[in-house]
Swiss-Prot record:
<keyword id="KW-0807">Transducer</keyword>
<protein>
    <recommendedName>
        <fullName>Olfactory receptor 8B3</fullName>
    </recommendedName>
</protein>
<dbReference type="InterPro" id="IPR000725">
    <property type="entry name" value="Olfact_rcpt"/>
</dbReference>
<feature type="topological domain" description="Cytoplasmic">
    <location>
        <begin position="218"/>
        <end position="237"/>
    </location>
</feature>
<dbReference type="GO" id="GO:0004930">
    <property type="term" value="F:G protein-coupled receptor activity"/>
</dbReference>
<keyword id="KW-0675">Receptor</keyword>
<keyword id="KW-0325">Glycoprotein</keyword>
<feature type="disulfide bond">
    <location>
        <begin position="97"/>
        <end position="189"/>
    </location>
</feature>
<feature type="topological domain" description="Extracellular">
    <location>
        <begin position="259"/>
        <end position="270"/>
    </location>
</feature>
<feature type="transmembrane region" description="Helical; Name=7">
    <location>
        <begin position="271"/>
        <end position="291"/>
    </location>
</feature>
<keyword id="KW-0472">Membrane</keyword>
<feature type="transmembrane region" description="Helical; Name=4">
    <location>
        <begin position="140"/>
        <end position="160"/>
    </location>
</feature>
<feature type="topological domain" description="Extracellular">
    <location>
        <begin position="161"/>
        <end position="197"/>
    </location>
</feature>
<keyword id="KW-1003">Cell membrane</keyword>
<feature type="topological domain" description="Cytoplasmic">
    <location>
        <begin position="292"/>
        <end position="313"/>
    </location>
</feature>
<keyword id="KW-0812">Transmembrane</keyword>
<dbReference type="GO" id="GO:0004984">
    <property type="term" value="F:olfactory receptor activity"/>
</dbReference>
Length: 313
């Protein structure tokens, strides 16, 4: 528990998304539905990709890992977030908070680079189709995936390590629904200069490098699509490409906006914008990247038919 003045904080209180009592119950059911849809969608795709050998290709390999990341990082904070809507005081221990911070950052940063790998995969498939099998070999895909997780581990370790060196004295109310970097820095009673420099460097790298790489990849992809002679083929490619760009913009845009708003002191706007990359995007990813795909639809239809036949007999 929190002791008196000049003593160290051993637990935090998560303020949650809103302090308006009339919104608590509706928001609980809303985010519960979002979480269930996220879990079912991503877990379903993981099982589908694992059981269907014809989906063991580079594109679906990255989608498998994306679903795994979304499944994990939604589960890192959502249970605590839901508790905040139904309990008067949502308490998390110091150790629990640092653990949540580490795994949240690990999965979020890993997702940034997994999305980058997926954009590169689409670039090679559309712009250099004849070299696709050679360029996107199993070894290359494994290296890109491993690199994504390594970047996630490095970023999470840097931020959490710097956070552990701080001292938290009297203030223990985190103005957020999860343990995140900037809300925690505001509570420290010691200098946060080193942490702020690390945030500037690490967050800058993990947002700018993936977003610029993805942007360049999609510029080349759009250029190639414009050379497609078939109007139907061109419109279909643009439809797929635009949905991907919207999902990516939501993820990177809301993450960048949240850090900008928290840095400028607009905490409430920062919390609301964070909902998009923490809750909305993991729910939409299966629909945008997988369930609109013809091969996935066929595999899903076959799986549902098998389940129906088993139930009949």
């Amino acid at each position: 528990m929190l002791a008196r003045n000049n003593s160290l904080v051993t637990e935090f209180i998560l303020a949650g998304l809103t302090d308006h009592p009339e919104f608590q119950q509706p928001l609980f059911f809303l985010f519960l539905v979002v979480y269930i849809v996220t879990m079912v969608g991503n877990l379903g795709l993981i099982i589908l990709f694992g059981l269907n050998s014809h989906l063991h290709t580079p594109m679906y390999y990255f989608l498998f890992n994306l679903s795994f990341i979304d499944l994990c990082y939604s589960s890192v904070f959502t249970p605590k977030m839901l508790m905040n809507f139904v309990s008067k005081k949502n308490i998390i221990s110091y150790v629990g908070c640092m653990t949540q911070l580490f795994f949240f950052l690990f999965f979020v940063i890993s997702e940034c680079y997994m999305l980058t790998s997926m954009a590169y995969d689409r670039y090679v498939a559309i712009c250099n189709p004849l070299l696709y099998k050679v360029t996107m070999s199993h070894q290359v895909c494994s290296m890109l995936t491993f690199a994504a997780y390594i970047m996630g581990l490095a970023g999470a370790t840097a931020h959490t390590g710097c956070m552990l060196r701080l001292t938290f004295c009297s203030a223990n109310i985190i103005n957020h629904y999860l343990c995140d970097i900037l809300p925690l820095l505001q509570l420290s009673c010691t200098s946060t200069y080193v942490n702020e420099v690390v945030v500037l460097i690490v967050v800058g790298i993990n947002i700018m490098v993936p977003s610029c790489t993805i942007l360049i990849s999609y510029v080349f992809i759009v250029t190639s699509i414009l050379h497609i002679k078939s109007t139907q083929g061109r419109s279909k490619a643009f439809s797929t490409c635009s949905s991907h760009v919207i999902a990516l913009s939501l993820f990177f845009g809301s993450a960048a906006f949240m850090y900008i708003k928290y840095s400028s002191g607009s905490m409430e706007q920062g919390k609301v914008s964070s909902v998009f990359y923490t809750n909305v995007v993991p729910m939409l990813n299966p629909l945008i990247y997988s369930l609109r795909n013809k091969d996935v639809k066929v595999a899903l239809r076959k799986a549902l038919i098998k389940i129906q036949r088993r139930n009949i007999f």
